């Protein structure tokens, strides 16, 4: 009898320890209200049990259809762990090696530096230490472009590095596209087919899919939202599939709970079979690229780490004495967070249909704190203060730029002299036209491979204009600065984002545009 009582007490204690925070629903509601999030999906796994897999809010503002456990959200860069896992499966099958050069599998692959071309490995594709700058090359696919995956990979040889090889961390997306090409070449399947059949199907993620374009197909899908001119509203989904290996998966709370379980179990599936080996599990969560440790804002003091780095598709850091494997994901209208605490067998996934990292982190860290049994911290208030300060800093930067503007200055040349075709070595051609009289003789900039990058050039000062993109959902207006030769002809054009809040994937600053002759071959 006493033994049965003891067992019952242990079981009851374990159940209490595994239970979600008692204030979870209220906390989520407060976070969503504070950060203007219409809909959210949440998955919590503890000790190989699904504690929560549920939806909150609505799929689309202005409609009443609720988010449920099966509602799909774009998980964006949380896809990277799937791509890394796919490569791990091929390593286990002896079809490739982590530390073999990429050119062994893709002989035509090349980077700017021949040394890097020769030495860059499969592992290097995943860990953000190639020497490319932050978001380098993203304009090849963001916003949606006409380049296909192979063409994007081929253009990497024209992107100059920002640092020396393996010397610094700088987040990129384009090398995950190359990883997708490696998977296709080695396996004989497209990245999409490989991940669908070899990972999603085996894990039981039957509701998920692997294409950006699928999110636009309708069904039980959360609509993307973003603040446009100060008001959150639905926006058009990102529907280009050329970057699926870096961020193309759409998933739900129900399916993400299954993914968390597999990762926390070191690759073991619920039926006892393995998706991947213990060796692959160690590879996925072992730091390769160190990341400098910086103090967080004072409002978020508990986030201070002792170590930080990037593994294979996961960031790795410590939090309150425990190792975390985590990642974020961001697309137009969707952001997400995955957090794994392997020592606690705890996993959290937060998927949202609004671009508020403050929302997903205020929820994720509240849940982690609960299972660590530490004093509650008001993450919502902390992230709110940091976000407000960041927003204010961005506005102040734009005000300072406006105050320093020389409003009396005029362009050095007649507007027609700025018109023409300009070429960047890695992006290709950009055309500047003098618009017709109906548009009052304004210059219009058009990116040849990015249909939505069409902008009216407003004179700013001297020979600098601002490209006001006609698609206002981009939120990425850019300075366009013309440099002249002594004879008054145009030597080159440089660009940069107007607002410091512009997404880093609009890597305008990496473009070096040179005028080309009218009879040059189009790029």
Language-model features: where?
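Short secondary-structure junction motifs
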Residues: 37-39, 51, 97-99, 117, ...
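Residues that line or immediately flank small-molecule/substrate-binding pockets and catalytic motifs
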Residues: 9, 44, 109, 129, ...
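Generic structural signal for secondary-structure transition and capping sites
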Residues: 37, 130-134, 160-161, 204-208, ...
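An acidic site on a long C-lobe helix of protein kinase domains
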Residues: 121, 175, 252-255
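Active-site-proximal loop and beta-strand segments within enzyme catalytic domains
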Residues: 58-173, 180, 187-189, 197, ...
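Bacterial N-terminal signal peptides that target proteins for export
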Residues: 1-6
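Catalytic loop of the DD-peptidase/beta-lactamase superfamily, centered on the K-T-G motif
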Residues: 19-54, 141, 184-197, 201, ...
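Hydrophobic h-region of N-terminal signal peptides that target proteins for export
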Residues: 8-18
